[in-house]
Amino acid sequence: MSQNKYWQSFGEVNDPENLKNLSQDEFQEELPFEGFDDKGLIDAKAPRRDFLKYLGFSTAAATLAASCKIPVKKAIPYANKPENLVPGVAKFYATTYVQDGDVVPVLAKVRDGRPIKIEGNKLANNSFAQGGTSARAQASVLDLYDMYRAKFPLHKVKDKFEEVPTFEQFDKLVGDAMKAAGGSVVLLTSTIVSPSTKEIIAKFPNLKHVQYDAVSYSGMILANEASGFGKRIPSYNFSAAKVIVSLGADFLGTWLSPVEFAKGYSKGRKIDEKNPSMSKHYQFESFLSMTGSNADERFTHRPSETGAIAVALLAELGGAVAPSIADAKMVASIKKVAADLKANNGAAMVVSGSNDKNVQIIVNAINNAIGAYGTTIDWTRPVNYRQGIDSEFAQLVADMEAGSVGTIMIHGANPAYNHYDADKFKAALKKVKLRVSFSEKMDETAELCEYIIPNHHYLESWGDAEPKTGIVSFQQPTIYPLFKTRPFQTSLLRWAGDTKDYE
């Protein structure tokens, strides 16, 4: 054990007793007010001399503080003032927030050339977000000024990233490496909702495109295909539903398109002359959610009972054999909900948050039985977000493990962080000869890549989005790119041999 002794000052070494006394008496003089603690400041008594002393000190301090002027900051005018710019007066630009499959038409508030606030665009197409916005969209302006953004193209040399001075040099490095890698070329992205981007991807020679979503809706897509509706997700009209039944779908919080659903849901919950009755909302779930907390009636169950409850509900509607459920209260609740669905045939809907294909097939059968299709659920205008298929991503990982993938380019996806088997993905990714990332930040997946060419932030970009078939929203830049970044679409064009720019 160490025998070293430590002191805070020389006084503690030379004269510890005196130092102790001095420290105890440092604030020995008490306030010269009698009865301050009991009577308060108004009734306190103090000697005239002490009163004048403290009054003089406070007056002098106030005079001194007032005489200290705040440093003058001079505003330097523009040498060439931008057109239609008034210093201090904000302007608004309509654009579209697109990230990880989420799509929200927004208005960006720009002051002195800098975006400072994001709001919903009430002038956008009323059949989608209807002027709503989300917490993620509101916070996205902070990403623009994030000090950890990738500021220029990077190339990993001996486990250390180095800056590539020009885009031309970067394109040559990647082009040469792509030829040397051989094998198949794969583009891994989150769901792409941009029609123009899809065209560019389709023109890239011998490119395999795999879409991956951190929150998967693969079970729903495959169930819809098995039910004869095609490999797609329908539009849900919550405003037209008099009865809403949710089987674990947090449609006001995170499920599919909560901004759009919250707007429709709120319309059905308001009572006025045109709508004298309010919609009824039943929620079956295993944990409390934003949607569950707003339900008229909420029923809790174990996560393992989700499928049984869906089958029991279908059985009450005459479409299946009722399963055995031990909870008598739950059985009674299911009967009550089924009766309400029957009474509102054609004006009800059932949604499920399960990613189990079989559960979603049962939910489709329930909606068919209550006449939801064509009224509250619309197949004529399917959505284009959340299109990732789990089996396609699993096949990609298997191909990487087998060494058949020569080049992989990754945009808007971070499976090394948010995939349930991230370690397996990391090990497979390391077997790919050429790994390129378009990430705006050095995330867990980008760290494993050899080349990084950061994409523009959406507030710096031109672009388009089609969240639903026939509904298009556009992106426009609200600020000049802050760093040496480039649209990932332009990179694809360059590496495909096209000299055009995306923007």
Residue ranges, per PLM feature:
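Non-catalytic alpha/beta scaffold blocks inside enzyme catalytic domains
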Residues: 165-169, 180-181, 205-206, 212-503
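N-terminal export/assembly segments and adjacent metallocofactor-ligating motifs
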Residues: 1-328
